[in-house]
Amino acid sequence: MNRRSILWSALSALGAALGGSSAKAATEAGAGNKLKVVYHLSDAEKVNFVLGNIENHIDGVGGPQRVTIALVIHGPALKAFHRAQANPDLGKRVGDFSRDGIELAACANTMKAQNVTLTGLLPGFVSAEKGGVVRLAELQSQGYLYLRP
């Protein structure tokens, strides 16, 4: 067996294993367990796109009571959520998310770099004290599926 065949076999096995875990997560969610999903947002130009994905996700599963969603924001994207410069539509969407129970986590490192506190952000945010990427890893270790649209 040559190296290429061994590599192909290993990749096929890995793909089957990963596909099985995704199928298991989907089956568990369909069996009455709420699916847990974390959305990752760092690109400023994707703010509206990601928020739209979350809205579509909630609508697609039949409402916020059927899914647990967290949104972790860091880097340039966080500027869009500064209270002083956020547009009213964005403020309404964030308020709706907060009322729906979506965790809105702002990276503490980014907040420090942008010289903003939680009171300077739109209402509903919590601070990811250890950093946004650490919060993403924590949520994934708790069974959240990771999405970065």
Briefly describe each language-model feature range.
Residues V50-G63:
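Histidine-anchored nucleotide/phosphate-binding helix
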Residues S5-A25:
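N-terminal export signals
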Residues P64-A70, A106-N109:
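Surface-exposed patches in mature extracellular/periplasmic domains of secreted proteins
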Residues H40-L51, F81, Q85:
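Short, glycine-rich nucleotide/cofactor-binding loops
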Residues K34, P64-R66, R99:
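Extracytoplasmic
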Residues A84-P149:
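A cross-taxonomic marker for long C-terminal extensions/tails that follow the last structured domain
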Residues G20-S42, K46:
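C-terminal segment of N-terminal export signals and the immediately downstream linker at the start
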Residues T68-A80:
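Acidic helix-start/capping segments at beta-turn-to-alpha-helix junctions
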